[in-house]
Amino acid sequence: MLTYDQFRYAFANAVDEAEAKRLYDTFPVPGSGVPLFQAAFANLNPSTEAQVDSKNPARGPMKLISGEKDHTVPWAIANASFKRQRRNKSVTEIEEIGDRGHSLVIDSGWEEAARVAKSFVDRFVFP
């Protein structure tokens, strides 16, 4: 399990100290690091479980949402994923939410990320 300082840096760097402590007490769970390493090295080992077929014709619309201050998946990584996925014939979009970190869907500003996601989904579910 991450220490509080690790969690604060990786997930809760864009919120104040009190909220970071609340998030740490509420959300972290111990788990294996194996999936993270598989994802990190997926391009070096294409047979890993994390392999993604970016040209899969059955893939639906995709919206990548990134936090401007995200230390865990910074813009460069999110944008690289977007560039790979946009080769797909289905709609692929990316949006960066300003002044937000990796906790953007669980912290006090979650509504903004939810609005971005909902407006994207509504375009395809309720056209």
Predicted regions and their residues:
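Short gly/ser/thr-rich secondary-structure transition/capping motifs
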Residues: 40-48
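Alpha-helical elements of Rossmann-like donor-binding domains used by nucleotide-donor carbohydrate transfer enzymes
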Residues: 6, 22, 80, 112, ...
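Conserved alpha/beta-hydrolase "acid-adjacent" motif
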Residues: 71-80
